[in-house]
Amino acid sequence: GAYTGMPNKKPKVPTLRQAKVQGPAFEFAVAMMKRNASTVKTEYGEFTMLGIYDRWAVLPRHAKPGPSILMNDQEVGVLDAKELVDKDGINLELTLLKLNRNEKFRDIRGFLAREEVEVNEAVLAINTSKFPNMYIPVGQVTDYGFLNLGGTPTKRMLMYNFPTRAGQCGGVLMSTGKVLGIHVGGNGHHGFSAALLRHYFNEEQ
C-alpha cells in the first residue's frame, strides 16, 4: 500500500496519555474491542471487523469479502454478505456478513444509535497487524452526510479531524457507551466513518 516505506516498529500497548485524555470513552472502547473486534484479511487487504450479534459482523464495503475470510488468521466461511444502500440505492459503505462459525458474538445492538450521532469526544479503535491495539482520540464527530468517497456517492458519513492513513479501515468509532460508526476513509486530515445504525441489524432484514 501507500505506506509500505514505514518502519515496522509495532507499539503493542495503548498509551496511557490517550487513556487520560479519554477516560470513560477510552475504557469503553478497549472493552468493546476486546470482546467484539477481530482482525480480518480479504483479498483487498486487512481490516478491523466488528461483530454485532449472533454470527453477524460488519466490514467496510470496499473490503469486498469473498466466500471466506481470514479472521484472526483462521479461515471462516461467509454464509451471507449484504452491501448496504439507502432507500434510493445510494452506497452506505458497509457490508454485513453472516459467518459460518459456532461461536456467537456478544450482542452489542443496544450500543448502536437509531440515527447519525454527533459527539464532542470520540475514540477511533483499530486492530490490525499494521496498527495493533490502537486507540486514537479524535475529538469532535460531526454528521457530514453526503460524501463522494473514492468516486462513489456515499451517504450517512460521520467526520472527525484525524490524519488517517491507509490500513485503518474497519476501525470502530466510539464514545462513552456508544458505537457510532465504522471508519471507511479519509482525505489526509479528516477521517470518515459510515454511521452504524441499529435498524441495519433488525432480525427481519
Swiss-Prot record:
The modification O-(5'-phospho-RNA)-tyrosine is found at residue 3. Pfam families: Peptidase_C3. GO terms for molecular function: cysteine-type endopeptidase activity; RNA binding. GO terms for biological process: proteolysis; symbiont entry into host cell; virion attachment to host cell. Residues 23-201 form the Peptidase C3 domain. GO terms for cellular component: host cell cytoplasm; T=pseudo3 icosahedral viral capsid. Keywords: Autocatalytic cleavage, Capsid protein, Covalent protein-RNA linkage, Host cytoplasm, Host-virus interaction, Hydrolase, Magnesium, Phosphoprotein, Protease, RNA-binding, T=pseudo3 icosahedral capsid protein, Thiol protease, Viral attachment to host cell, Virion, Virus entry into host cell. The record marks 22-23 as: Cleavage. The active site is at residues 62, 93, 169. InterPro entries: PCV_3C_PRO, Peptidase_C3A/C3B_picornavir, Peptidase_S1_PA, Peptidase_S1_PA_chymotrypsin. Gene3D superfamilies: Trypsin-like serine proteases (2.40.10.10). PROSITE patterns: PCV_3C_PRO. Its EC number is 3.4.22.28. The keyword Manganese does not apply. Signal peptide: none annotated. It comes from the Viruses. Belongs to the picornaviruses polyprotein family. This is Genome polyprotein. It comes from Echo 9 virus.
